C-alpha cells in the first residue's frame, strides 16, 4: 500500500484543515520495572517451565499505525478509525 508523505487533513487542535506529515508509529522501548515484567521474571526464575501457554501462531500481516503531525501547531494525532492491516507499506511523494 502506498501512502503520501504529506496530506491535507483536519487538525482537531487547530480546528481547521492543514497540511500534515504522515509518520509510522515506532515501537517504544519496553520498561523492565513494570509490575507485569517483575512478576514474569519472578515466576520464570529457577527451575520449572513457562508459566503460561505459548502462542500458537502469529498473524500473517501486522497492523500499521499512522500518526499525523500538523505543520502549523506541531501536535500529533492518530486516525479516527484506528490502524489497519497491510502486507507491504511505503510512503510516496505526491
Curated annotation (Swiss-Prot):
Cofactor note: Binds 1 zinc ion per subunit.
GO molecular function: large ribosomal subunit rRNA binding; structural constituent of ribosome; zinc ion binding
Protein name: Large ribosomal subunit protein eL42
Cofactor: Zn(2+)
UniProt cross-references to InterPro entries, sorted A to Z: Ribosomal_eL44, Ribosomal_LSU_eL42, Ribosomal_zn-bd
GO cellular component assignments: cytosolic large ribosomal subunit
Family, per entry: Belongs to the eukaryotic ribosomal protein eL42 family.
Pfam family, one: Ribosomal_L44
Matches recorded under HAMAP family: Ribosomal_L44e
Keywords (A to Z) from UniProt: Metal-binding, Ribonucleoprotein, Ribosomal protein, RNA-binding, rRNA-binding, Zinc, Zinc-finger
Organism: Methanocaldococcus jannaschii (strain ATCC 43067 / DSM 2661 / JAL-1 / JCM 10045 / NBRC 100440) (Methanococcus jannaschii)
Summary of subunit composition and partner proteins: Part of the 50S ribosomal subunit.
Job of this protein: Binds to the 23S rRNA.
BP GO annotations: translation
Residues annotated for Zn(2+) binding in this entry: 11, 14, 70, 73
ZnF locations on chain (C4-type): 11-73
Amino acid at each position: 500500500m502506498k501512502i503520501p508523505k504529506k496530506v491535507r487533513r483536519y487538525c482537531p487542535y487547530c480546528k481547521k484543515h492543514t497540511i500534515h506529515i504522515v509518520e509510522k508509529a515506532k515501537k517504544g522501548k519496553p520498561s523492565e520495572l513494570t509490575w507485569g515484567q517483575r512478576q514474569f521474571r519472578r515466576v520464570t526464575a529457577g527451575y520449572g517451565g513457562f508459566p503460561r501457554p505459548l502462542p500458537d501462531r502469529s498473524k500473517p500481516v501486522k497492523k500499521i499505525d499512522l500518526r499525523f503531525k500538523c505543520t502549523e501547531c506541531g501536535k500529533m494525532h492518530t486516525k479516527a478509525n484506528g490502524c489497519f492491516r497491510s502486507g507491504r507499506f511505503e510512503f510516496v511523494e505526491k
